[in-house]
Amino acid sequence: LVVADITRAWNRASEFTGHVDNQLNDAGNPHDDIYIDFAQGTHRVHTDEENVTCVGEEVASRIKMYQHVSTDKSMLTHVGTTTRGTDVWIDTRVVEADKVILINAISTHDMAGFGGGRKLILPGVAGFETVQQNHCHALGPTVGSGLNPDAALLKIAGNPVSEDMQEACDMIAPCFLVHSVINAEGEISSMVGGDPYKAWLEGTREIYRMQKVRMKAQTDVTIVSAGGYPKDTNLYQGTKCYTTAEIATKKGGIIITMIEAEDVQEPPAYLGSFKYKNLTEMEEGLRACFTIPLFVAFENLITAMTHTVYIVTRPENFDILRERTHQIPVATVEEAWELAKKQLAEEGKEDYTINVIPQGSAIVPYVEE
């Protein structure tokens, strides 16, 4: 069983992994023949308590559990090369298993279109260099070309990151998939199971039906909230609403966002990514060593340089935001709105349009036509 790691514990897999195990037992597979390999990707290993959080106490007490370490080459097996040139190294325990079942949830994903499914194999149980090669497909062909527009939210067909992941997954050929679909309240809305690709694809359609919100057109101003605690505990998490805001806002428009960021320094890898002098240097750094915190910072900097971003946050965060992120910190929404109105007047915009999005990371806006 390849099970998502602690960073995806919101998937509520602890509530249904036991049912999968029971079905396997009923089919004649004893506990000794079943094991879990956590899909850590490039994340750290779990504590014992986190193992229990992911799969539940009953499962954790009766099934062997292993941690995937992407940098441990002694536990990786080369299974092939994708058509895009990614050398696919996968956790040997997964490669040598007679059957592989994927357990997670389905969500939207900025880079891969949707999460879940093939992502449990790559990056989930892939080697570090394999993950690096795959994720670099999220960038354009040359330095200076920035983000690859095909590696985008909701996009599967023609998405080089997603298609590369799917190729790697097909090399392992999982036999089954069980995924939850989680609603905005964090509850299981539905479940999908069956063929690892077809069931996952049906789940992506369900997520799209749940999260899509129609808008008539992009607007001059978008007021967006990250969604409050715990979605805005830091900038790394809170800025997930920027993708939604960008879709809803005209290029060069104004974004007013609310991110409290009580732990503004966390994670250090994200805030430290703003050390580069300019966008080109940041892109060069990303191509040299691709990390998700650096990629998120790169996306955020592009947003701040193509829009005016007013961020309502704690006053103690102001200096960090001014110095590093090219965003304009303010203490209240009212203050941000006064600055926005002044900017609109200076631009000669009297008949401006506004979108208001209370839960920025929980919806996907789309233009009516």
Regions found by a protein language model. Give the residues of each.
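Histidine-anchored nucleotide/phosphate-binding helix
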Residues: A9-N29, T239-A248
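An acidic, phosphate/nucleotide-engaging active-site surface
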Residues: V45-G115
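Short glycine-rich or small-residue beta-strand-to-loop segments that form or flank ligand, phosphate
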Residues: L1-W10, Y35-G41, I223-S225
